[in-house]
Amino acid sequence: MIIAIDGPAASGKGTLAKRLAAHYGFRYLDTGVIYRAVAKAMLDAGADLTDEARAAEVARTLDPSRFDDPALKSHAVGEAASVVSAHPQVRAALVEFQKTFAAAPPGAVLDGRDIGTVICPDAEVKIFVVASPEVRAHRRFLEAQSRGEPADEAVILSDIVKRDERDKNRSAAPLKQAPDAVLLDNSYLDIEGGVRAAIDIVEAVRAGRRRV
């Protein structure tokens, strides 16, 4: 079984995906980390983030050991990832890696922005996770505080709104809900409530009550 979880930045999709993977014993891939790793490599090299050919070359030679770098979680890297992920050549370079991961038994949970529409369009379960920009900005603010990083919630909110626009309007794999995805708004759900709602969706599919 493949579970595809998509949604905008800081919507809580990563937490849901990790918990679902643990619950069902499936492999988990945060596809956003892949793009963050490309962005971090570009930043480290002092490269122009708008240089699509350079970014695509980084993507093709990406070292998976980079995926565990704590620096990938920084706000600056996240913003840079939004830029490089808009390049069609970068996305094309990383598609096969994601598809191969998803196809491996016993099952996989992937979260990102185009899992249900591009990477795994035939996924048995598709969930589109959303939350209001204000709630998402506050979450990111608290995350930054927990890491001891200086943060301005108003700036984070502005960045999130701009990122949403970039993600929705990019030419390559824009952020959008797949027609057969279930919408899950977790603006006012705690983590456990969101996980329970997601498990209910998956169980409905497993029981044959619903083709998501």
UniProtKB/Swiss-Prot annotation:
InterPro entries: Cytidylate_kin, Cytidylate_kinase_dom, P-loop_NTPase. ATP binds at G7, P8, A9, A10, S11, G12, K13, G14, T15. It catalyses: CMP + ATP = CDP + ADP; dCMP + ATP = dCDP + ADP. SUPFAM superfamilies: P-loop containing nucleoside triphosphate hydrolases (SSF52540). GO terms for biological process: pyrimidine nucleotide metabolic process. Pfam families: Cytidylate_kin. Its EC number is 2.7.4.25. One of its GO terms (cellular component) is cytoplasm. Its main location: cytoplasm. Keywords: ATP-binding, Cytoplasm, Kinase, Nucleotide-binding, Transferase. It is found in: Cytoplasm. One of its GO terms (molecular function) is ATP binding. Belongs to the cytidylate kinase family. Type 1 subfamily. This is Cytidylate kinase. The lineage of its organism: Bacteria, Pseudomonadati, Pseudomonadota, Alphaproteobacteria, Hyphomicrobiales.
